Amino acid sequence: MNHLEGSAEVEVADEAPGGEVNESVEADLEHPEVVEGQQPSPSPPPPAGHEPEDHRGHPAPPPPPPPQEEEEEERGECLARSASTESGFHNHTDTAEGDVLAAARDGYEAERAQDADDESAYAVQYRPEAEEYTEQAEAEHVEAAQRRALPNHLHFHSLEHEEAMNAAYSGYVYTHRLFHRAEDEPYAEPYADYGGLQEHVYEEIGDAPELEARDGLRLYERERDEAAAYRQEALGARLHHYDERSDGESDSPEKEAEFAPYPRMDSYEQEEDIDQIVAEVKQSMSSQSLDKAAEDMPEAEQDLERAPTPGGGHPDSPGLPAPAGQQQRVVGTPGGSEVGQRYSKEKRDAISLAIKDIKEAIEEVKTRTIRSPYTPDEPKEPIWVMRQDISPTRDCDDQRPVDGDSPSPGSSSPLGAESSSIPLHPGDPTEASTNKESRKSLASFPTYVEVPGPCDPEDLIDGIIFAANYLGSTQLLSDKTPSKNVRMMQAQEAVSRIKTAQKLAKSRKKAPEGESQPMTEVDLFISTQRIKVLNADTQEPMMDHPLRTISYIADIGNIVVLMARRRMPRSNSQENVEASHPSQDGKRQYKMICHVFESEDAQLIAQSIGQAFSVAYQEFLRANGINPEDLSQKEYSDLLNTQDMYNDDLIHFSKSENCKDVFIEKQKGEILGVVIVESGWGSILPTVIIANMMHGGPAEKSGKLNIGDQIMSINGTSLVGLPLSTCQSIIKGLKNQSRVKLNIVRCPPVTTVLIRRPDLRYQLGFSVQNGIICSLMRGGIAERGGVRVGHRIIEINGQSVVATPHEKIVHILSNAVGEIHMKTMPAAMYRLLTAQEQPVYI
């Protein structure tokens, strides 16, 4: 909406049907003299030989005698007025809210070329789903043009027809219609009455019988009430829609949270929003004035109905008038004329007041910056809401850090880090009060639970900056969940690739075109939302990764490796293979983007990123109404300090009678005849266990070894902490010896576990898959209780779970509280003892 006075032709874009208010009001701004003084043009004479009919199609009685020519002239003017008005109401389309609708002007074609740029900037495309409705409107426009050829006929516009037209557009909020005047139609006041835009037009031609006029009046009153209710409902819906989208947002933290993920618009989009707000203000204020006029209208009409008729009030009196057009006229009734003039004056006063308010609102919009309801201001203080991931290209301007912002004296951020938090409007008290109210409405949780790390949690919310040198980036293919050792190997490979590329670049006099020079100075921006790499000089974002895509961070000396995950696109053949083999889902390859930096604060950078994950997790808990203290690490550590290590293994190993040196005699070239398995990660002394012995072999014939015995050393060589393959190689090397010395600890094949879990809030600290313990949390209550990775659970609290389904085992463990007694066995030993695997003796 760049100007109020503009075109003569109605610009039909996709505007809400509330737009007719804009058109009518702007028409008044341009032609105030039309509303007050212009008279409608006389109607064209009826065709020769055509007899006028009443509204039911019966021939009308002959015209009155010549002395009543003035009355007929007045009725002719009224008929022309109603005919033009009715044809106008049959020509309407819907346009979208916020477009410009201007009144008529003869020089429109000359101005159209000058305003081409404005039209291209502010034009709104048609709604694709409204095509069916537009076609119906055009068809009705043709029908109305045909009906104008018979000005002496009465054309009924029923509510059922309107509802049928709205069937294809029923999903939209607004239901008002626009007046669209044909280009060749002479100007006649289309909005003589702003209070009844959808009332029906009836005209009495000649002296109709009193009974028919009375029936027409009753029909008019009934349909007028229905149209008024329909209009008020639609108008109320539009006002309610406007209030929901604008007025209620700045006062409600829930609304702020709802619109928080939207990115900030550039200047072009802000201009569009200002124009849209102006349109909404005009519609709202004009509609209020029209609503008031609609409320006052029934009183005036009641006065007209109670006015004395020339026949003395008899119902069959031939002088009973029928309503003419949108404005009631009583022929030959002075009292009725005065009432109509008074009502018309009140109407003009209400419209003038609305125009004045609109002008003031427009001036206020021009002189004051208005925040669009779709781009709420960023808060100066963090508001605890769950945030959605936004595209890096859309919101990089929102979180772009500013140089020179050092951390506050009381901040616990590291010396190498700078805080990037600055208020958008430092002197705006409204924003500060809104933020305070938002914080009061949140759960009364502590601000932060202590999170280990070098930074203050509040600084991580706003973002901190580290200075670094960008060395380069490379891509690696990785599994979905590789181990830490694999991650470190990938990080080292990325560093070696970058250093090799640097050496090649140094060997050349000039780097190839399109390849960045090494050692670019950058600012590494770290927050709970994302990690950005900014050019130190221009502050332009070079890389931007949401925090949730960061899979690994490693510091190797003064080198920092940042690894971000990206899904590798798959070909059709790969998709077909995975569709036929769902088990291959975990084997998908992922692209890992590895960025390599050099910084003196490499360790601080890695620790800060790890701390950002912890603070982001607390944000998630608070947004879901969970007190972070309920799951704090401190409380869990206090629980561990109250528990003693389950020391049955330690006591067993410390007893001298359980530790023995065993000598095995055998023939040279003969194998020892044993099967060994790992004791399992989490045991007191990680070593190998005898899982099976060959029948008739040297180990079995000696009678000194049992299944479950742990081998500490062989011929003075310790096996503690060695990989299983190494231990197997050592035993295989005994083939040429005739005497073997083994140091063993006698242990039962089944291990006893005791877990103390005081409450369901505390996790057990291990995971189970098909009855086998596959992972264990270091330092948790499960490790203290003697749980070992690679063991199969045999028994839980005295109940055997050997043949129990996996889901039931998980259910039992999840609901177990107090002391949990379990018996486990190495899974490989279990398979050998149950003949699920064939032993391979060494």
UniProtKB/Swiss-Prot annotation:
Location relative to the cell: Cytoplasm; Cytoplasm, Perinuclear region; Nucleus
Domain PDZ, residue spans: 661-746, 752-828
Pfam families: PDZ, PID
Post-translational modification Phosphoserine, affected residues: S82, S246, S250, S252, S267, S284, S289, S317, S372, S406, S408, S413, S573
Principal place of residence: cytoplasm
Tissue expression profile of the protein: Isoform 3 is expressed in brain.
Entry-annotated residues carrying Phosphothreonine: T309, T375
GO CC annotations, alphabetized: cytosol; glutamatergic synapse; Golgi apparatus; membrane; nucleus; perinuclear region of cytoplasm; presynaptic active zone membrane; Schaffer collateral - CA1 synapse
Alphabetized UniProt keyword annotations: Cytoplasm, Golgi apparatus, Nucleus, Phosphoprotein, Protein transport, Repeat, Transport
Nucleus as UniProt keyword: yes
Biased composition (Basic and acidic residues): 106-115, 240-258, 392-403
Superkingdom of the organism of origin: Eukaryota
Stretches assigned to the PID domain: 460-648
Disordered, as annotated region: 1-121, 238-349, 366-439
Listed Low complexity bias regions: 404-421
InterPro entries (alphabetical): APP-Binding, PDZ, PDZ_sf, PH-like_dom_sf, PTB/PI_dom
Region (Autoinhibitory helix linker): 631-648
Keyword Phosphoprotein annotated: yes
GO terms under biological process: chemical synaptic transmission; establishment of localization in cell; gamma-aminobutyric acid secretion; glutamate secretion; in utero embryonic development; intracellular protein transport; locomotory behavior; multicellular organism growth
Subunit: Part of a multimeric complex containing STXBP1 and STX1A. Interacts with STXBP1. Component of the brain-specific heterotrimeric complex (LIN-10-LIN-2-LIN-7 complex) composed of at least APBA1, CASK, and LIN7, which associates with the motor protein KIF17 to transport vesicles along microtubules. Within the complex, interacts (via PDZ domain) with the motor protein KIF17; the interaction is direct and is required for association of KIF17 with the cargo that is to be transported. Binds to the cytoplasmic domain of amyloid protein (APP). Interacts (via PDZ 1 and 2 domains) with FSPB.
Role this protein plays: Putative function in synaptic vesicle exocytosis by binding to Munc18-1, an essential component of the synaptic vesicle exocytotic machinery. May modulate processing of the amyloid-beta precursor protein (APP) and hence formation of AAP-beta. Component of the LIN-10-LIN-2-LIN-7 complex, which associates with the motor protein KIF17 to transport vesicles containing N-methyl-D-aspartate (NMDA) receptor subunit NR2B along microtubules.
Entry text on domains: Composed of an N-terminal domain that binds Munc18-1 and LIN-2/CASK, a middle phosphotyrosine-binding domain (PID/PTB) that mediates binding with the cytoplasmic domain of the amyloid-beta precursor protein, and two C-terminal PDZ domains thought to attach proteins to the plasma membrane.
Protein name (database record): Amyloid-beta A4 precursor protein-binding family A member 1
Source organism: Mus musculus (Mouse)
Gene from which this protein is expressed: Apba1
